[in-house]
Regions:
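N-terminal type II signal-anchor transmembrane helix
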Residues: 1-43
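Hydrophobic alpha-helical membrane-embedded or membrane-associated segments
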Residues: 10-19, 339, 343, 347, ...
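Extended lipid/amphipathic-ligand handling interfaces
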Residues: 38, 51-54, 81-96, 128-140, ...
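N-terminal leader/targeting pre-sequences
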Residues: 44-72
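Secondary-structure transition motifs
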Residues: 64-173, 271-299, 313, 320-349
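Short beta-strand segments that buttress and anchor functional surface loops
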Residues: 64-65, 188-197, 206
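Short, solvent-exposed aromatic-acidic interface loops
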Residues: 105, 193-196, 223-226, 266-274, ...
Length: 354
């Protein structure tokens, strides 16, 4: 008869106690480690309030991640993420025998601020956020999700303050596990939806390499039914006019190949009314010069628009070399877009004078 072997009861008890102690202590150790990583990010500093472990599903949650600007007077954080959930993809584990993760940002709020100067503005530039994400989530990512997020642009230095928001932001960035495959220049796919200014639906699709240099990508953006009066705080601050009524659609398609960017943007405005004599000139809170300026802007739109449909449409050609600037690809991308829109506006303005 074979002798049966069994583990001593004291060993089982000690192992159980050790696992319980580890389960209790590990979240605090992880939190302290991540906070140390987030404490030194140049102009920005991050903090995590708590970590929750769910070992039974191979997951952990980061609670209340806040990233704020250290210098300057910026009253809101760059990022506030109440919950970040990271879990192992069991499908990939069983199908491909690879350990990859899915990360979900729940109700994140990302806020950019124009403070009038670089010190008091908040753009997120100057930090390699991809490296910070890898530090926060030290596992091979395959998919990144955003659920019920908010994207905002604020300016607290003007009256009325500018507060533009896209709410109900839901996005999926998939196929990140193949970004190291050099044979596929645009391996990841991005799909996103949102409500701009409370009600205008936004749709965004892109194919790109999020860990690359933005040399190769395809992008499609569409926003419909923008109520132009919702933009008045922005137009008042940056162009000194108001919309009395009107709605708009905006479409943009861009493609980059080896750093060469090409595409177009097409704003379509309908039933636009910018100048109203009773509201703008007779309004005691506005001076005569401001009212006359809005009249000029409004008449310019009237000349350009389709008389039968009361519609103003324009196609703005966008092109440029992302490698031609001694700055980051993202900064070059913004500069090319800015130059295209400024050029289009100047061309239309000059055309109206003829």
């Amino acid at each position: 008869m074979k002798k049966r072997y069994s583990l001593p009861i004291w060993f089982i008890t000690a192992l159980a106690i050790a696992l319980i102690v580890l389960h209790i202590a590990l979240p605090g150790l992880i939190r302290d480690y991540l906070n140390k990583q987030l404490a030194d990010m140049g102009d920005y500093r991050g903090h995590i309030s708590d970590i929750d472990l769910a070992l039974w599903r191979g997951a952990y949650q980061i609670n209340e991640l806040t990233i704020s600007k250290v210098n300057g007077k910026v009253p809101v954080p760059l990022l506030n993420a109440p919950v970040i959930d990271l879990s192992v993809s069991w499908r990939a584990l069983w199908k491909n025998r690879s350990i990859v993760a899915v990360v979900e940002f729940q109700r994140p709020a990302l806020t950019f601020v124009d403070g009038g100067n670089a010190t008091n503005s908040q753009t997120g530039e100057g930090v390699d956020w991809r490296a910070q994400l890898r530090g926060l989530l030290p596992i091979h990512l395959n998919e990144l999700r955003v659920t019920n997020g908010t994207l905002a642009f604020r300016n607290f230095t003007v009256q009325p303050p500018v507060d533009l928001k896209a709410t109900n932001v839901n996005a999926q960035l998939q196929n990140l596990s193949n970004v190291t495959d050099s044979s596929t220049p645009r391996p990841a796919k991005l799909n996103a939806t949102a409500d701009v200014l409370g009600q205008a639906p936004l749709m965004l699709k892109a194919e790109l390499d999020p860990l690359g240099n933005l040399d190769d990508f395809d992008l499609q953006l569409r926003i419909t039914d923008i109520q132009l009066k919702q933009l008045n705080s922005f137009t008042r601050a940056y162009a000194n006019f108001d919309f009395n009524k009107g709605d708009a659609d905006f479409v943009m398609e861009l493609a980059a190949r080896k750093g060469q960017l090409n595409g177009y943007a097409k704003p379509i405005l309908r039933q636009v009314d910018i100048f109203d004599w009773k509201q703008d000139v007779a309004n005691k809170d506005k001076n005569l010069i401001a009212g006359l300026w809005e009249a000029v802007v409004g008449s310019g739109g009237f000349v350009l628009k389709n008389q039968r449909q009361d519609q103003l449409a324009s196609r703005i050609e966008i092109s440029g070399d992302l490698n031609a600037y001694d700055i980051s690809r993202w900064q070059a991308f913004k500069a090319i877009l800015r130059n295209a829109f400024v050029k289009a506006f100047n061309s239309q303005f000059d055309g109206n004078k003829r």
